[in-house]
Design a protein with these regions (language model features):
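An acidic, low-aromatic, low-complexity terminal/linker signal
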Residues: 1-247, 253-262, 269-277, 283-295, ...
């Protein structure tokens, strides 16, 4: 597995590292992503999607408070907002990480939550094709449960892309999906959803179960497109519409092998899926990411994770799709 990468130095620190993020929105639909590489003091190289990172700085003064979850170093004040700071190696339970506090902090925005992640050091930004990103079946890291994907640098070194959803769920708890009113004649509706995070798949499944609708899922964009194309081809052979098998498609934005933007473009450009709404459900909640979703034709964009908002977005769209 290899890929040509474009690199950007991260040694400038501060805002300069992230100042061109807005220009990167043109990556939407190109099946490419940009990864910020960093170290946790082990032999591994880790990465995080650039769109999740707001800034990088030296580790600031951190205020410790009682009863913090394991891995949470404390709180900082950042431009008037108090945010928690996690020591990422502890949150990922890396037993071979050196003791002591990481010297750099990545400020991230994830699922409408701003967090600081302490890391040993920040390297550079690379651009990589999503089809060169793989699920982490072969990862042997001590923190393998917190890795959502892997890719490879031109020198053969592997990059482990961290599963922020899993880290947050284990640190702060997954949250409870509350009461959701079931849909009338819910058994008539079918949802197909795709997300590479097991935490997200579990939560989405809970919401759909409470709505009472039937559902199927995939774990990455390529798997989703393969299965959806197969469903459409089978329906075509039987002289039926694929809408009899799926009434709505729910997609994550960033996924191994094919991202949600390319998946949406494929769906929207295939007449067999005419009339089937596509909802993008992503932890990348900025307006820029909403615009990226709109540019490829999504019918709605929902930021993770609010079970009520997700349910109330899907409900009228399913009813309308069922009538059409």
């Amino acid at each position: 597995m290899s890929s040509a990468v474009m690199t950007t130095s991260a040694t400038g620190g501060g805002h300069s590292l992230m100042e061109s993020v807005d220009a990167r929105t043109k990556l939407a639909g190109s099946n490419r992503m940009e990864i910020l590489l960093f170290s946790l003091g082990t032999n591994e190289t880790f990465g995080i999607n650039v769109f999740k990172v707001r800034e990088v700085s030296k580790t600031p003064t951190i205020t410790r408070t009682p009863n913090m979850p394991a891995g949470v170093e404390g709180l900082i004040s950042l431009r008037g907002n108090v945010i928690p700071v996690l020591e990422l190696s502890q949150a990922m339970q890396l037993t071979d990480a050196p003791p002591g506090r990481g010297g750099s902090m990545m400020v991230t925005e994830y699922s409408k939550r701003t967090l600081g992640f302490l890391v040993h050091g920040v390297d550079r930004i690379i651009r990589v094709e999503w089809d060169k990103v793989r699920a982490p079946e072969a990862v042997t890291s001590g923190g393998h449960a917190y890795i959502t994907a892997i890719t490879e640098l031109p020198n053969g070194k592997l990059v482990s892309i961290v599963d922020v959803e899993q880290i947050l769920a284990n640190t702060f708890g997954e949250g409870i999906v509350g009461q959701i009113e079931p849909m009338h004649a819910a058994e008539d509706f079918n949802v197909f959803f795709v997300d590479d995070s097991s935490v997200a798949r579990k939560k989405i499944g809970e919401v759909l179960d409470k709505l009472g609708v039937k559902h199927k899922h995939a774990a990455n964009g390529l798997e989703a497109w393969t299965r959806l194309s197969g469903m459409a081809g089978h329906a075509q052979q039987l002289g039926r519409s694929v809408k009899e098998e799926v009434n709505l498609i729910l997609v994550d934005a960033e996924m191994p092998e094919m991202d949600g933007y390319v998946l949406t473009k494929n769906i929207k450009s295939d007449p067999r899926f005419d009339g089937i709404p596509v909802v993008m459900h992503s932890s990348l909640s900025s307006e820029a990411n909403r615009a990226m979703g709109k540019s490829v034709g999504v019918d709605a964009y929902v930021a993770k994770f609010d079970a009520d908002i997700l349910a109330e977005t899907l409900r009228p769209m399913l009813i309308k799709a069922g009538r059409d």
